[in-house]
Amino acid sequence: MTLFSNDGPLGSISSDAIKMPGTFFGYWHDLNWLGYEQPSASPGIYMALGLLLQKSVLYLKWCTPICLVILGLSAWFFFRTLGLRNLSCTIGAIAAAYNMEVVSYACWGLPSRSLTFATTFLAGAFILRALESRPWINLTIAGICVGLGLMEGYDIGALFSLYIAAFILFGFVIKPLESGKQTNLGRASGRGIAGIAVVALAAGLASSQTISTLVGTQLKGSSSGNSENTQAAKEQQWNFLTQWSLPKMEALRIVVPGLYGYRLDTPSSYDSEKLVSLEGGRYWGSMGQDPVLEQINEVEEIIAAFGQRNVLPGELAQVMNISVNQATQLMSLVQNKGRFLQRHSGSGEYVGIVVFFLAVWAILIALNKRSSLYSGTERRMILFWGFVALASLLLAFGKHAVFYQFIYQLPFFNTMRNTIKFLHPMHFALIVLCGYGVEGLIRLAKLETKESSKLIRKWIIGSSIVASIILLFSLIISSAKKVLAQHIAGQGFPLEEALTMASFAGKELIITSIFLIISVFLAAKILKTKAASPFVIGLALLVIADLTRANLPWIQYDDYKYKYNNKNPLIDQLSQSPHKGRVTISPLPSGSLGQLYGIEWLQHQFLYNNIQSIDIVQAPRMSADHEAFERRFTITGDTNTHYLAGRRWELTNTRWILGSTNDLAFFNQKFDPKKSRFTSTNSFLIGLRPDARNPNSPVYEDLTTQFNPTGPYCLIHFDGALPRAKLYSHWEVQTNDLATLEILASQEFDPHAKLIVNSQIEPSAAAPNKASGSVNITEYKPKEIQLTADATTEAILLLNDHWSPHWNVTVNGQPAELLRCNFVMRGVQLKPGQHEIVFRFQPPVTWLYVSLTSLLSGFGLLGFIVVRDRKKSTD
């Protein structure tokens, strides 16, 4: 068994393209579309674990727990640097390592998020040290920690770096106040800005390789980065970036786990073995909902007002004051409502009711100016982190509130996708406040003054009343589950299931209230008992129990042997010499085949078996050439454009199409009307595998294929697809990209007879049908393709893989010019004769060595500090 990983499944990390240590020197993903460059592996903690745990199975088993342990240790170091006692540090570390947001992301396949938290804690610790001694050395180490955070979290690391900058400035401004001196705000701010500059420089150098590869693969040439100023383009960009905004009511998930459910598939088959029943735990909120659905719901309300009769587009247009054409489009959206994403849940936001209770305690005590529990600096720090938590929550609301609009136009924020990411620093701040809260409890328990006794009595009474009210409220809500069920049913769930989900939400609310009451009881015992340590330990165990119970639904497992050792004849056939032809699914409705293809085969089996597909699993930011190519070959409502589907497959070496047996005639008639080059090879059916574990309610892993002449599905072979490599004696030079796309899409153009070259070379002088010779692929690897060619005349070798400036080519061992052909493909010019050609993916690695040097320098500085501190303590 391995831990479930949605974003890094075994199939993906087992593919040839991602093998270590090669990805440190460039990552070319060859299994989707025509291939494309992905961010190279960064020399950080996460990839170091990947290098250490070379075997994919071992990696999935151990990477997540190791990352969470690193987070806990880093948080402990941060709290110790704050000057908190060991028990406070331990509870703070537990709150960090068991935090639901961190754990849920790690169990979703993103344990690197926990490392971003860890490096931020480390950066904060060294910033605190810089305020006391050796400021420039400690700030440099803090900067390297920030750089590691950028490596681990990309835009999450960048977001945390902004908070770190604010923390540095705040720390330097309040530092002089410790001694009671009147601070010079300008001078203190200047030192803070200088500190930010040092941290930024060190972070930039440490993460230079990551920044370089991200700019080259995710931002430069990205179609989502187009700066169109039309209102429609701005609205589309806003919707794209804010789709994953936190609905305001769902902020309750921060203090009540499971109030809106957990995963979309809760309970899964593995949940039946857990101690607590998760029946009804399916997520029913609106996180990630497609913005189009808001418009659809508005139209549905208007249509409902007409009563039972059918509404004509003209009537809808009149009511909404729009054109008939727009009304027709809106009604079409309503009819296809099910195609849009209703909701998605891949993470939990529960901080822990005990953690939240302690954080609130710290803030309330800090706001009490008469209390002496915290020093002036500690009080200011608590209020700083309280402001960070509140501001981050408000920004996480994104499109659901006005706050994010104030910063949306600023650099970085106008490209950062998903405002829910602001919940990361909110959780971080609450964890810090939790540590302060525990420390405050212990300090108050040790005070033996009249004022402290009065404060303890008031606090215990107040906390007990609040906890009792919350418990009573939760019982009332639980008893009114029918009302909640009606609301859930309105979100698109059957009433019977909605009742179960409402019961689950009520149960979660009651359990959370009980944990709150227990935490109040333990806090009271800490305050009223001289021997507080046992009850502080009890509080630590309560944090573990609360967060462990809440995290259980996120912890899922895969039986990788059962999943990937599936004897599937179709997969076996496609995995033989996969570079000879790409695979896709029929664009026509294919029922269960389409679902099996999209969810199980494309995302898992194809990757595991290195099968190349023209389809893409996920590409939130599509490259500009990719987007332009796909847009030009998209079928429109005009039936005369059907041939574009066949032309797209022809140009992209898409040789295998999975579809219904009835699709063959349609393909030859519509997609290839002049040549009818689609043929059926093997018919097959989909059924249970012999060793199916869930025969009564099968999941995708339980299914396989069986070749059968009477099967409803077939593997269609497209004889017209261009080979992966081909020699051309006749080519046309065209440096205008739009003109190139028009030529390629023209029905009169024959891709087998003529090549379009988009580089500045001499036009061909050969006749159109002159023989050019032969070419063979002798070895095909993701980052190196070896070929032999026997050119009978001057020719261009076309390799039907995606062009990138980071690909190089040699002919007979000598460097040659890499040509861009057919808009997006690679090519090289050959003289007559026999040749050995090698294409290699070799992006620059200068920044990798800069990052490594910076990290080694950081270790050197850290060693210097450790040695000097030990020497100082010895003296």
Residue ranges and their predicted role:
Residues 1-72, 94-106, 110-117, 121, ...:
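Membrane-interface coil-to-helix junctions
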Residues 1-14, 208-223, 477-486, 554-557:
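Helix-to-loop transition at the C-terminal end of transmembrane segments
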Residues 109-119, 126, 130-144, 155-157, ...:
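Contiguous transmembrane helix-bundle modules in multi-pass membrane proteins
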Residues 189-247, 258:
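Polar, glycine-rich mid-to-C-terminal structural blocks
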Residues 245-250, 259-293, 484-489, 539-565, ...:
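Extracytoplasmic/lumenal acceptor-recognition loop(s) of multi-pass membrane glycoenzymes
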Residues 357, 722, 747-875:
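Active-site-proximal, structured, solvent-exposed surfaces of multi-pass membrane proteins
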